[in-house]
Amino acid sequence: GHIRGAVAFPLDWLTTIDGPEVARLLAEKGLTADREIVAYGTGAGDAAAFADRLVELGLPTVRTFDAGFGAWAADSTLPVDKLVRHDRLVHVDWLAQVLAGERPEAAPSGPFLLFHVNFGVPEEYAENHIPGALYLDTNWLENPADWNRRSPEELDRAVRALGITRDTTVVVYGRDTEGDANEKWPGRRAGQIAATRALMILRYAGVEDVRLLDGGYDWWVRAGHPLETFQREPTPVGSFGAAIPVRPDVIVDLDEAKAILADPEGAALVSVRTWREHLGNVSGYNYIGPAGRIAGDVWGNCGSDAYHMQHYRNIDNTMRAYPEITANWAEAGITADKWVAFYCGTGWRASETWFYAYLQGWERVAVYDGGWFEWSQDPINNPIEIGEPLDESAA
C-alpha cells in the first residue's frame, strides 16, 4: 500500500539511471522545483537518501516523513490506498524468501510452482533461470494456427502435464531481451508479456492463485539473487480438479466483442496497440496483413511496438504505478463500472493489461482472444476503421 495521493518513485531510479532520463522521470511524476516535496519510505534511511539526492538534482524544498509508511498505516484514521489483489503481483525479495523456505506475508498455503515462461525458447531456460523454476512454453497453452487459447481438452492435458491443479499457487515470470520487431519470431524476446499471457490462460482454466513476478527475470538478476542451470522436469498430476474453463468470462470471443461494441455507454473494447497500428499505418505483425482498427474501439496504448509495453511499465520493467494506469484509462472512458475487454493482435498485450485491471479488483474484465488477427479476416462482417479517429479520447 501507500499513503493516499503519494507518487511512486523508487530510490533506485535516482542512483542507477542517467541524468537526462532521471530529469524526464521527475518531471513526468510532477516532482519539480516549484513544489514542496515530502519523501517517505519504509524507514527514515531511504527517505533521507532520496531527499538528499533530490536536493543535489536542484529540487530545493524536500522534507522527509521519517516515521515511514509503517507508522502511517498503523493509524486506521489515516488514508491508505493499495491494490485490491496486491498479493498477485510479487516482489523478487518475497519470492527469494519463499524459495528459502520462509513464510512472508501471503506465502503459498499449499502446493507451489514457479515457471520460467517464453514462446518456444527452451534453450533460454536451459542457459539459466531462477532456482526451482520449471519451463513453460506458451505453445502448450496456445494454438499455433491463430495464437488463441487451446481447447479445454488440450488445456486440461497441458496443465496436468505441468503438475498444475486448481489449488496450486503458480508464480510466472519471463525474460525480456533486445531484438528487432521485424525478425521472424520477435515474441520470443518478450518473455514478461508471455508470462502474463500464460497467467491469463491459467486463470481462465481455473487456477485459483496465479501470480506474476514483478519485473521478471531481469529484476531478479538486478536485485542480486542467484540463478541456476539445473533443468527440472514437472511431476504430472492425474486431475486438474475441475472442468476447464472454470472462468470462461476471462476471455470473450467474436460475438461478445460485438456485444461490447454495441454498448458504448456500458462497455469498452480497448485496443492495446501502438498509435501506428491504431491509425492503420502498420498491422504490427509479420504474420498479419491487414492494417487498421476495430470500428468503435477505444485506444489503450501499449508501447513502441507489438512486443513492448512501456506505457504500462516503469523504466525498470516493473508494473507502472496503478493510479497512473487507472487515470490514463479514465481519461479514455475505460472504467471499472463497465464491461471491459482488451484486445491486441492475438492476445499477448491484452493479457498484460487485463492483469493490471484484475489486480485492481475489476470484476467484469476480459481479453478478446481473437483480436485484430481474427477481426481483420472478415472486413465485410467486421467493420474496420483507419486514419485519425473522430473521438480523440485515449489512454
Where are these regions (language model features)?
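Cytosolic catalytic domains that perform sulfur/thiol-centered chemistry
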Residues: 1-395
